[in-house]
Amino acid sequence: LVPRPDTATAIDSPETLEFASRRAQATCVVRTYQMAALTKGRLGREMTEIGFLLDAGAIAFTDCDAVVTDTKVLSRALTYARQLGALVIGHPQDPGLSKGAAATSGKFATLRAIPAVSAMAERLGLERDLAMVEMTGAKYHADQISTALALPALERAKQQGLDVTAGVS
């Protein structure tokens, strides 16, 4: 089991990671591994101490559904992650296009009057993240891909030899 670090107090320091690990070991009947936040407080402003978090047991780094919009912060975090062999998990979305949305545009969202986002928001977010991965050489997993528009970008990244994977939702 690998819980996400989007807890009430973000898992963004070795101390919070070690606390979560101890708590899981004491209460879970299954083996758990911990992910840590990529940025402090998952706010996208300052990267976490990736090396110390790896030493404390983190197996990957993610800000979960929060997009790191500052490309300088993301570039720095991806560079550190690459140097340390760490996996970064991103939620590819363009935050401007996806703000307030709860579903991807389509019949389902329309019939239920759910605030929707164009599939282009995912594609734009993924294209940006993959460009940053190409620049830094980091290992990257695109979390919760939900549109066909994202697939060509992933295919191109794999053809270029980038170390990328994806999950679907």
Give residue spans per PLM region.
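Histidine/acidic residue-rich metal-binding segments in metalloenzymes
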Residues: 47-169
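Active-site beta->alpha loop and helix N-cap motifs at the rims of alpha/beta catalytic domains
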Residues: 37-43
